[in-house]
């Protein structure tokens, strides 16, 4: 059978969160009542991802930056989570208007991300093209 990759499932989840939606996954049992091993494997892998990044999904709403081809944002209070799913560049413009950015950092490593103020928003200087399935930058507003 054809199962989605963990990366695809994580992208579905992140996109749903960034668009104020829910993700329902239809995983049916086999004739013997057991769940398919591949489905259990994917769920376990998503669980490992959620152990690190769950805070950027649970209890959030779609962020103040609308969804784009590069990804989505989620937000909890003054914490904006930038989920970079598909970026072919080392920098990313965020149309934040006059919103002040106190700090920005890589969510997983906690390393600072350089922020450059520009007309209409800010540019995140990532240092390299993201290769993770979901690079998350947290911005304190």
Predicted regions and their residues:
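Mature catalytic domains of secreted/periplasmic carbohydrate-active enzymes
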Residues: 1-141
